[in-house]
Amino acid sequence: MRLSFVVPAYNEEAYLPACLQSILSQTAAYPGQTEIIVVNNASTDRTRELALSFPGVTVVDEPRKGLTFARQAGFAASSGELIANVDADSRLTPGWLTQVLDTFMHHDLASFSGPVIFYDLTPRQSVLVHIFYLTAWITYVINRYILRVGSMVQGGNFVVSRAALEKIGGFNTAISFYGEDTDIARRLNDVGEVHFTFGLKMFTSARRLKNEGMVTMAVRYTINYFWTTFFKRPFTDTYVDIREAQIVEPQPEG
């Protein structure tokens, strides 16, 4: 079973190296079974140059700015039976790849996803994020099993089968940012099993949360989740790119 990593990247020279290192540290155990595709999404910094400096990494250029354009370009360039979508400011947690491959080997899934763990928050902030995730989980259960109107996918930490993604026509490029993962979860749920588990974690940067504020970000994501679920389009059409140079190393979970 071949797996393709797709990493969209717009001006990610500060974070991309750590992301790729985390992927390569796990793919080494599966020679010939994986590929890594970085989608250079109209970057003006050294993103493309840095990506090419890593052995075995393929760079695809997508001049149309936007997350879904980048995800779709990566999907089109990939060859794997599974497509792993990882954000450029994220890093795989230990055992991530093994868990994904084992899960798809033993279960017929359209998609497999889990939460992101912010590695650069204070303990108090981390507790608040966990409370938000608990609320999101309850919402997911109600929507999927009671209202039957959708499912849940974490956009920067999900793996999808090529067959399922082809059935739904790929990513919805009409959605630029907010709601893109809710949209694809809803559509994938129509063609197969969309499984979300807190057991599949991904380290990621809290740069957007720090820039926008926890309350603002939580409200914005919640509104767009419901809007996309029930009206099939996001409430918020615009977004701001958050980029920074400071790097914080992820800490293992205690």
Indicate residue ranges for each PLM-predicted region:
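Glycine-rich, basic loop-to-helix element that forms the pyrophosphate-binding segment
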Residues: 62-78
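Short aromatic/hydrophobic "clamp" motif used to bind/position activated sugar donors
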Residues: 83
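Acidic donor-binding loop at a coil-to-helix junction in glycosyltransferase catalytic cores
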Residues: 177-184
